[in-house]
Regions:
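Interhelical loop and adjacent transmembrane-helix boundary motif
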Residues: 2-4, 48-56, 219-276
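Short membrane-interfacial helix/loop motifs at transmembrane-helix boundaries
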Residues: 21-55, 226-231, 283
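Periplasmic/extracellular loop-to-transmembrane helix junction in inner-membrane transport proteins
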Residues: 4, 35-71, 245-246
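Hydrophobic alpha-helical transmembrane segments of multipass integral membrane proteins
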Residues: 58, 62, 66-78, 82, ...
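Membrane-interfacial helix termini and adjacent extracytoplasmic/periplasmic loops
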Residues: 36-41, 45-46, 50, 110-158, ...
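C-terminal transmembrane helix and the adjacent membrane-cytosol boundary/short C-terminal tail
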Residues: 2-10, 86, 134, 170-185, ...
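Transmembrane alpha-helices
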Residues: 11, 16-23, 103, 107, ...
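Transmembrane-helix boundary motif in ABC transporter permease subunits
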Residues: 1-5, 70-101, 114, 118-121, ...
Length: 294
């Protein structure tokens, strides 16, 4: 028995080394004073300073931050409302829509990216044809040209972020006492007041977790962004890929370390919140059982 446990521990250690050793090497060599990726030449922050003077990286960071924040906010609103709608449905319709909701998460990113690209190209062509038709008929030409860019990138991120928000909010809805909203309305609250002051606070943990997950997914995305951003817009993941194709620069180690740190901080926040939520739920159930036994 002890031998089996020892082998299991060794196996787990080897798996973790295999998973995290490359990331650890990347982080260490992001502080290497030399461009040589095999020899340590001393500690430096030179490559991080160079990032601040790299206009392409700065622009990609601004695009990434803007898209991630906006997509997370919109997806959180849409996902929360959709989760409430799904929860209020009967069993069969809810199962159907939940299956549809899970498709973007189980589907290959390249298929989702190509599909969204074709959809956006189709609609941008229709809009450009409409602008041309209006200009020909009225003589008034709108100074617009619809094409793949920031808006299509944002719409794509909202599309794949929303299902994660829905799955984060639904567990909170299942734990919600259905009588709370009715009790609030019996005490004089309007349906909107009952929702905002009674129901919404109960859903807050799931909403916050969903927003953080959505933000993390947007920051980390490459494949879908690559197909939907167009030629004039680039996020950090796309910029790192472009830099890696030209030449392997230590700046790639630095920007990858920054991305990894951001994602890890958000994941730690999610895990801490989940643990606290589980502990609070366990305390609540324990209190109910104690009251019931009296």
């Amino acid at each position: 028995m002890r031998k089996a446990l020892g082998i299991s521990r060794i196996y787990n250690i080897l798996v973790y080394i295999f998973l995290y050793a490359p990331i650890l090497v990347l982080i260490i060599f992001s502080f290497n004073d030399s461009k040589n990726r095999a020899v340590w030449s001393g500690f430096t922050l030179h490559w991080y300073v160079d990032l601040l003077h790299n206009d392409a990286i700065i622009n990609a960071f601004i695009v990434t931050l803007g898209v991630s924040v906006l997509a997370a906010l919109v997806a959180t609103v849409f996902g929360t409302l959709a989760a409430i709608g799904f929860f209020s449905m009967r069993r069969k319709p809810r199962a159907f829509f939940m299956g549809v909701n899970n498709i973007p998460m189980t589907n290959a990113d390249i298929i989702t990216g190509v599909s969204l690209m074709l959809l956006f190209v189709f609609f941008t062509q229709i809009l450009n044809d409409l602008v041309y038709f209006v200009g020909m008929q009225t003589g008034f030409w709108l100074p617009v040209d619809f094409h793949l860019g920031f808006i299509t990138l944002l719409l794509a991120h909202i599309t794949f972020d929303t299902p994660y928000v829905i799955l984060s909010v639904l567990p909170c809805l299942r734990q919600l006492d259905k009588n709370l909203s009715e009790a609030a309305q019996d005490l004089g609250a309007t349906p909107m007041q009952a929702f905002t002051k009674v129901v919404l606070p109960q859903l807050r943990p799931g909403i916050i977790n969903g927003a953080i997950i959505a933000f993390t997914m947007s920051v980390d995305d490459f494949v879908i962004s690559y197909f939907t951003a167009g030629a004039d817009v680039s996020n950090l993941a796309m910029e790192v890929y472009s830099m890696a194709r030209r030449h392997i620069s230590p700046e790639i180690n630095a920007i990858s370390t920054i991305l990894f740190t951001i994602v890890m901080i958000l994941l730690i926040v999610i895990n801490v919140r989940s643990i606290r939520q589980e502990q609070a739920e366990a305390k609540r159930l324990h209190a109910l059982q104690r009251d019931a036994s009296r």
